[in-house]
């Protein structure tokens, strides 16, 4: 199973996948974020609303704008290829879905990550 993505002109890595809850499945491009710590994914508020996510609590984060509270939870899944992973998330007000590098490192099915001509290819077992 291969998952393909791109390296943007600004040097960001994006991979395609789905966020799933119950029977709902929304396609999105995930930006790989090396500084995003504590949760597996950061989901834009509009996607969270479409999936009817039910965050379990609010948590305080320090952002460039100062301290802010964001809803967090774990009632959703991330689908990469044909594999599904339960994820913890925060909901935030940004148009980009973020995926934590720490989360990707924990996926035991990842065999190879290769970079070719501004493309990224992730091979899963």
PLM region spans:
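Pepsin/retropepsin-fold aspartyl endopeptidases
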Residues: 1-125
């Amino acid at each position: 199973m291969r998952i393909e993505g791109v390296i943007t002109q600004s040097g960001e890595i994006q991979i395609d996948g789905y966020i799933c809850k119950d029977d709902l499945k929304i396609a999105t491009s995930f930006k790989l974020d090396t500084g995003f710590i504590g949760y597996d994914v950061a989901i834009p508020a509009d996607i969270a609303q479409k999936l009817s996510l039910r965050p379990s609590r609010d948590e305080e984060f320090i952002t460039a704008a100062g301290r802010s509270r964001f809803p967090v939870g774990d009632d959703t899944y991330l689908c990469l290829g044909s594999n599904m992973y339960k994820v913890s998330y925060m909901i935030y007000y940004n148009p980009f879905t973020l995926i934590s590098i720490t989360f990707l490192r924990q996926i035991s099915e990842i065999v190879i990550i290769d970079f070719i001509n501004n493309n990224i290819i992730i091979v899963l077992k």
